[in-house]
Amino acid sequence: MKSKTQKLKKGLYIVSTPIGNLKDITFRAIDILKKSDIILCEDTRNSKKLLTHYEIKSKLVSYHKFNERKISKEIFSEIHKYNIISLISDAGTPVISDPGKILIKECVLKNMPIVPIPGVSSVTATASI
């Protein structure tokens, strides 16, 4: 069993968030978000609801289709400042239909680890009934 105080490796964490009910999030996702140096999100107003609910005080930066290139460039120009970068969407798993592909491509080019943090699956919930 791993220690509760286990350090996270430096990298980009793709963190799934609840689709509707704020309680539909994994303990691991909450832990990653609390340990993040910076959280990139689509809409800070929506994300603040989730982060406030779980007392997550990490720096929050708006990251959407209109500023994706600019923010990705800024993040990588200051990458030495960040160990844990998390990417979240307003609901569900980032990058599926949300921004993030540019950031992921940059991480791959710079050999920066990318870690997916899965969420609660509505597909398996539906299949169970």
Where are these regions (language model features)?
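Short beta->alpha linker loops
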Residues: 42-45, 66-67, 91, 118-121
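Generic short alpha-helical segment signal, independent of protein family or function
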Residues: 56, 68, 80-84
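Short glycine-cluster motifs
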Residues: 80-129
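Glycine-rich, flexible N-terminal cofactor/catalytic loop recognition
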Residues: 1-66
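Short glycine-/acidic-enriched loop or helix-start segments at secondary-structure transitions
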Residues: 24-25, 50-51, 72, 96-99, ...
